[in-house]
Swiss-Prot record:
It comes from Human papillomavirus 52. One of its GO terms (biological process) is symbiont entry into host cell. Residues 74-94, 203-214 have a biased composition (Low complexity). This is Minor capsid protein L2. The lineage of its organism: Viruses, Monodnaviria, Shotokuvirae, Cossaviricota, Papovaviricetes. Interacts with major capsid protein L1. Interacts with E2; this interaction inhibits E2 transcriptional activity but not the DNA replication function E2. Interacts with host GADD45GIP1. Interacts with host HSPA8; this interaction is required for L2 nuclear translocation. Interacts with host importins KPNB2 and KPNB3. Forms a complex with importin alpha2-beta1 heterodimers via interaction with the importin alpha2 adapter. Interacts with host DYNLT1; this interaction is essential for virus intracellular transport during entry. Residues 74-95, 203-224 are annotated as: Disordered.
């Protein structure tokens, strides 16, 4: 059973005690002199200041900073700062913007109307000349009114393209004025723009292979939950209700937590000290969202919880961080020598043909190449030599009859005739004399290039002479 610890109450200040105990006369002995300023230190300063004058040195009960100007010699004057007065001007009148005026004020002035100057001279109507004639020879008097000269004025304005945006220039409206007046005025046109949809090309990249300070956006690496740190208490929960309704382990049947989403963080109100159904969940104020992890061969359901074991006078709560976990099922390791029966992916092809061995009534034996020991006699005008045929000469025998291994297996047919091979060469024969135990190499073979492991001119260990 837990007992509530007595709270520590702060003592009232001297001013608060003086306001309540002065009228009743129950004040402590050190409260009244401190508030009314009648302590020994206050008496010394009060009567000592009558005979001692320190001036503006700033020596007193305050901080020893020497006053605002600091400690300066007595023969000098402290520096004074000169205050400069500026001319007071009336404030600039800000004209308000009406509701129908545009919110963007253009930096280009609008069209300015320029007066044409002096009025155009009036030309009198052509009324002719007044001619007066007389009988005597007197000169004629002609009244001619002087006609003023017509004036031509040209006014133009130029814009600096550096400070103006490109715009569509439209012809100005015709001016109704007398005389010849040439003028130009800037025109303001509204900008038309087109909204072009932009596409963001997002490619996934590995965070370990990033070579620039601004990596390509993509999938971020998985952050560690920090469930098994030294500052986190590990608590194993056996009750399976921890996965479906964890609020039942923290509080008793409370309708406030009936419709709470258990996949998110659950906050509990701990304004009152109430016992928990499970003592492991005592003083829990928050259960964070769950996480499924695998550790040491098991599937684990985890939640982080915050406790409010202590609470300060300012209202701050202090508690431990607890990791609650529930092992769902173990992960069985796979056997090393486990035999897995495999099934064929494609159906086995069944041949529609069968071989009946009983139909074979003729058996073909393996043919052996015959070797004939027939003497071959060569006659020359000097000697007669007898050389056996099987001493290095190949003799091929081809049978004249056709051989088949069975009724269903045809063999290629062989020619029935025997090729003609002459026994004796048609070229003129030459006498060969074999005697002695050595040989003489022909001089033409000395200039041949030596080849590796090839000796075409070695016949025997006897001398050969033609």
């Amino acid at each position: 059973m837990r007992y509530r610890r007595s709270t520590r109450h702060k003592r009232a200040s001297a001013t608060q005690l003086y306001q309540t105990c002065k009228a009743s006369g129950t004040c402590p002995p050190d409260v009244i002199p401190k508030v009314e300023g009648t302590t020994i230190a206050d008496q010394l300063l009060k009567y000592g200041s009558l005979g001692v004058f320190f001036g503006g040195l700033g020596i007193g009960t305050g901080a020893g900073s020497g006053g605002r100007a600091g400690y300066v010699p007595l023969s000098t004057r402290p520096p004074t700062s000169s205050i400069t007065t500026s001319t007071i001007r009336p404030p600039v009148t800000v004209e308000p913007i009406g509701p129908l005026e545009p919110s963007i004020v253009s930096m280009i002035e609008e069209t300015t109307f320029i007066e044409s100057g002096a009025p155009a001279p009036s030309i009198p109507s052509a009324t002719g000349f007044d001619v007066t004639t007389s009988a005597n020879n007197t000169p004629a008097i002609i009244n001619v009114t002087s006609i003023g000269e017509s004036s031509v004025q040209s006014v133009s304005t130029h814009l600096n393209p550096t400070f103006t945006e490109p715009s569509i220039i439209q012809p100005p409206a015709p001016a109704e004025a007398s005389g010849h007046v040439l003028f130009s005025s800037p025109t303001i046109s509204t900008h038309t723009y087109e909204e072009i949809p932009m596409d963001t090309f997002v490619t996934s990249t590995d965070s370990s292979s990033v070579t620039s300070s601004t990596p390509i956006p993509g999938s971020r690496p998985t952050t560690r939950l920090g469930l098994y740190s030294r500052a986190t208490q590990q608590v194993k929960v056996v009750d399976p209700a921890f996965m479906s309704s964890p609020q039942k382990l923290v509080t008793y049947n409370n309708p406030v937590f009936e419709g709470v989403d258990t996949d998110e963080t659950i906050i509990f109100d701990r304004s009152q000290l109430l016992p928990a159904p499970d003592p492991d969940f005592l003083d829990i104020i928050a259960l964070h969202r769950p996480a499924l992890t695998s550790r040491r061969g098991t599937v684990r359901f985890s939640r982080l919880g915050n406790k409010a074991t202590l609470r300060t006078r300012s209202g701050k709560q202090i508690g431990a961080r607890v990791h609650y976990y529930h092992d769902i099922s173990p992960i069985q390791p796979a056997e090393v020598q486990e035999d897995i029966e495999l099934q064929p992916l494609l159906p086995q092809s069944v041949s529609p043909y069968t071989i009946n061995d009983g139909l074979y009534d003729v058996y073909a034996d393996s043919l052996q190449q015959p070797t004939f020991h027939l003497p071959s006699t060569l006659s020359t005008h000097n000697n007669t030599f007898t050389v056996p045929i099987n001493s290095g000469i190949d003799f091929v025998y081809q049978p004249t009859m056709s051989i088949e291994s069975g009724p269903d297996i045809p063999l290629p047919s062989l020619p029935t005739h025997t090729p003609f091979v002459p026994i004796a060469p048609t070229a003129p024969s030459t006498s060969i004399i074999v005697d002695g135990t050595d040989f003489i190499l022909h001089p033409s073979y000395f200039l041949l290039r030596r080849r590796r492991k090839r000796f075409p001119y070695f016949f025997t260990d006897v001398r050969v002479a033609a």
